[in-house]
């Protein structure tokens, strides 16, 4: 009897810290606060001392981060637009996403990664646009260099992504570094995966100089790709996310299923399976799919069968204004008529009990 009891006591601290509810990244709420930087720094709930310190010290960076929140939440919603959970946000909730991210799920892994990536992208872009006092274009990209096409001169303004990554790591990871629990380690891993994703799509752009564009001389610079590429990449990582458990000394992960490979620094990791998101459930933070538009002809996640969780759907006839009878006129315009188009819209039926689900 002693050995099993000893094993239980060994794992009990890890289990208790695993279940901690303090997992929301309160800096996400910076989108909703607005106002001056001082007001923002003092009124965003849940910032740790290091985050408030950086907030007061770098108000211009905070403005860039707060503007970036809308960008990465929009990207999250784009990637999940055909899924039961569609990355919906709650404007009056300081965690931005409500209770749904209290679960250490795939969705949590994606949100932490895309938000960390969004901070890198927003700061780096602000650096290149001359909006920040603490950084500018990448100072290392000077002089002459060589690539597969020959020599070129560094010119223009190379995106200073190393500064963006460094500041994002200091600000975003500050709260997680104060904790030693399993969820903090999960968040740190996914935060890093998000930062690395932005740098993955840094590309070299060049301009040719010479007679008739002969490219005798080239001037090149490094530029971030559109954030959609980062979002699509992290979406693929979400679909291939690896379920993990804590190792015995509580310092890292091991795969939950031994048939799968160990996660790399680029992979997303999670602990818990996701709910089905079919019905409104206050405890799970699920808004359900009642009223969601579904695709009658699709066989994917947006199909009426999958989106509506087998509850069926309602169909309504709606009209919308579209462009029609378009003709090309010389030179150089396309002129169209405005036409009314009737189409059927299918929306998921509500469950028989439309109230908030009561957990049993």
Curated annotation (Swiss-Prot):
UniProt-recorded Gene Ontology molecular function terms: cytokine activity; frizzled binding
Family: Belongs to the Wnt family.
SMART domains: WNT1 (SM00097)
Chain ranges passing through the membrane: none
Intrachain disulfide bonds: 76-87, 127-135, 137-157, 206-220, 208-215, 278-309, 294-304, 308-348, 324-339, 326-336, 331-332
Annotated function: Ligand for members of the frizzled family of seven transmembrane receptors. Functions in the canonical Wnt signaling pathway that results in activation of transcription factors of the TCF/LEF family. Functions as a upstream regulator of FGF10 expression. Plays an important role in embryonic lung development. May contribute to embryonic brain development by regulating the proliferation of dopaminergic precursors and neurons.
Subcellular location: Secreted, Extracellular space, Extracellular matrix; Secreted
Protein name (record): Protein Wnt-2
InterPro entries in the record: Wnt (IPR005817), Wnt2 (IPR009140), Wnt_C (IPR043158), Wnt_CS (IPR018161)
Record key words, sorted: Developmental protein, Disulfide bond, Extracellular matrix, Glycoprotein, Lipoprotein, Secreted, Signal, Wnt signaling pathway
Sugar attachment sites: 295
Gene Ontology BP terms: atrial cardiac muscle tissue morphogenesis; canonical Wnt signaling pathway; cardiac epithelial to mesenchymal transition; cardiac muscle cell proliferation; cell fate commitment; cell proliferation in midbrain; cell-cell signaling; cellular response to transforming growth factor beta stimulus
Highest taxon above the source species: Eukaryota
Lipid tethering residues (O-palmitoleoyl serine): 212
Signal peptide: 1-25
PTM info: Palmitoleoylation is required for efficient binding to frizzled receptors. Depalmitoleoylation leads to Wnt signaling pathway inhibition.
Coiled-coil residue windows: none
GO cellular component: cytoplasm; extracellular space
């Amino acid at each position: 009897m002693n050995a099993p009891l000893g094993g239980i006591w060994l794992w009990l601290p890890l289990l208790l810290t695993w279940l901690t509810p303090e997992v929301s990244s309160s800096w996400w709420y910076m989108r909703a606060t607005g106002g001056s930087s001082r007001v923002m720094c003092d009124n965003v709930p849940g910032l740790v001392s290091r985050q408030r310190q950086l907030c007061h010290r770098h108000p211009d960076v905070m403005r860039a981060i707060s503007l970036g929140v809308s960008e990465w939440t929009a990207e999250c919603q784009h990637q999940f637009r055909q899924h039961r959970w569609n990355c919906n946000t709650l404007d009056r909730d300081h965690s931005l996403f409500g209770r749904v991210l209290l679960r250490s799920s795939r969705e949590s892994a994606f949100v932490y990664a895309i938000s960390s990536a969004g901070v890198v992208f927003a700061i780096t872009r602000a650096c290149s646009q001359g909006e920040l006092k603490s950084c500018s274009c990448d100072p290392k990209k000077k002089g002459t260099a060589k690539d597969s096409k020959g020599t070129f001169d560094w010119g223009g303004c190379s995106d200073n992504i190393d500064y963006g990554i460094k500041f994002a790591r200091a600000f975003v990871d500050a709260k997680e570094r104060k904790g030693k629990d399993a969820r903090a380690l999960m968040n740190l891993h996914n935060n890093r995966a998000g930062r690395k994703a932005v740098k993955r799509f840094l590309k070299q752009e060049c301009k040719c100089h010479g007679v008739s564009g002969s490219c005798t001389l080239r001037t090149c610079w490094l530029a971030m790709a559109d954030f959609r590429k980062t979002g699509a990449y992290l979406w693929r990582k979400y679909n291939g996310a690896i379920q993990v458990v804590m190792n015995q000394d509580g310092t890292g992960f091991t795969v939950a299923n031994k048939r799968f490979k160990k996660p790399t620094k680029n992979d997303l990791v999670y602990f818990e399976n996701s709910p089905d998101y079919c019905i409104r459930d206050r405890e799970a933070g699920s808004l359900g799919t009642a009223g969601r538009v579904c695709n009658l002809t699709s066989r994917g996640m947006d199909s009426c069968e999958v989106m509506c969780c087998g509850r069926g759907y309602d169909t309504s006839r709606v009209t919308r204004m579209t462009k029609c009878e378009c003709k090309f006129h010389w030179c150089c315009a396309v002129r169209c008529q405005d036409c009314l188009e009737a189409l059927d819209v299918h929306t998921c039926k509500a469950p028989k009990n439309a109230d908030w689900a009561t957990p049993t």
